[in-house]
């Protein structure tokens, strides 16, 4: 949100426009192809980056947000290929191990002021390390009367939330994982299947019809999805489109399995039938491109190429 607000404020300074991309853990070529699709430049291997460098010219300086960066090696290769481009890059990440960039840490303001952001669960503030996501989830559980503050505090302590341990990933936050653990034990199989799909889908957000189809739950998913929403386990960035916070996704992925090939096939078939949905579904297409690259599946890569030609990109 801060990156979007910054882009809105500086927009007049960039004749080449302000552009936002969700990048995740995709490889450098997929990142390049994302920009090529947006800018209408060639996407073949040999012309991909030279064409982007020409597009990002001194005459058209461009502001580009690369949101939710995860793969340092892929990002380093991508940015190094475009180091001569006339673009201002804003990269958002929970952590960054790149040289050649300037780091601007962002901290929730009430944390630095020592104030309570969620009065209903104020006693949990220190226990949850002032983490806004964990506090929001705890507040949702308490406000929905799923559990009271005292019982939740006891659960967290019994789970070792106050212990010091090494984490395996920047999204491995014990205070959030424990809240997910509490909820998971109380969710029905349909709700768990919905969470599993959202945890393994690589696009930004998933339409309700796609979510129910991939989870194989049909209309039976409505009630469980509403419960997930009340408990703030899911996000609804657009009406009828659902996603997980990256930290919640990490906590769910470790306990679920989903056939990623089925997700790949679903979104290619969807866009082949409904090319008018490209704007909302484009990150799923980029995820399919990355899947085809990493699996070295020539047939699927050619299918994606035909789809892109149909879409006029």
Predicted regions mapped to residue ranges:
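Short glycine-rich substrate-engagement loop in P-loop NTPases that contacts/grips substrate
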Residues: 39-50
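Hydrophobic alpha-helical core bundles mediating ligand binding, dimerization, or RNAP-core interactions
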Residues: 52, 176-180, 248, 264-267, ...
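A short hydrophobic beta-strand->loop->alpha-helix junction that borders the nucleotide-binding pocket
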Residues: 18-27, 108
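C-terminal boundary/linker of central alpha/beta nucleotide-binding cores
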Residues: 3-4, 135, 139-140, 181-265, ...
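Extended alpha-helical scaffolding segments used for macromolecular assembly and cargo binding
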Residues: 190, 258-313
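A conserved switch/coupling segment of P-loop NTPase cores
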Residues: 4-15, 48-118
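Alpha-helical sensor/transducer elements of the RecA-like P-loop NTPase core
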Residues: 1-2, 29-36, 81-141, 151, ...
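Loop-to-helix "switch" segment enriched in basic
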Residues: 136-191
């Amino acid at each position: 949100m801060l990156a979007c607000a910054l882009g809105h404020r500086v927009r007049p300074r960039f004749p080449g426009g302000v552009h936002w991309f969700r990048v995740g853990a995709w490889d450098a070529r997929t990142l390049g192809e994302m920009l090529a699709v947006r800018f209408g430049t060639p996407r073949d291997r040999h012309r991909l980056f030279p064409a982007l460098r020409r597009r990002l010219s001194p005459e058209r300086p461009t502001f580009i947000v690369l949101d939710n960066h995860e793969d340092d090696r892929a990002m380093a290769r991508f940015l190094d290929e475009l180091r001569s481009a006339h673009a201002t890059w804003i990269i958002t990440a929970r952590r960054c191990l790149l040289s050649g960039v300037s780091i601007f840490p962002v901290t929730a303001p009430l944390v630095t002021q020592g104030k309570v952001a969620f009065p209903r669960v104020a006693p949990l503030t220190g226990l949850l390390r002032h983490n806004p996501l964990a506090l929001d989830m705890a507040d949702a559980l308490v406000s929905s009367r799923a559990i009271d503050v005292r019982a939740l505090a006891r659960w967290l302590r019994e789970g070792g939330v106050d212990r010091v341990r090494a984490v395996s990933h920047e999204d491995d936050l014990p205070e959030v994982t424990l809240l997910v653990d509490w909820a998971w034990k109380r969710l029905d199989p349909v709700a768990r299947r919905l969470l599993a799909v959202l945890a393994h889908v690589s696009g930004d957000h998933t339409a309700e019809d796609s979510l129910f189809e991939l989870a194989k739950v049909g209309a039976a998913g409505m009630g469980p999805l509403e419960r997930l929403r009340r408990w703030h386990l899911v996000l609804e960035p657009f009406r009828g489109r659902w996603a997980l916070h990256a930290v919640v996704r990490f906590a769910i992925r470790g306990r679920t399995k989903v056939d990623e090939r089925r997700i790949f096939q679903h979104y290619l078939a969807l866009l082949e039938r409904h090319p008018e949905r490209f704007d909302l579904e484009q990150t799923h297409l980029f995820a399919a491109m990355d899947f085809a690259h990493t699996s070295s599946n020539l047939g699927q890569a050619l299918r994606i190429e035909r789809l892109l030609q149909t879409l006029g990109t």
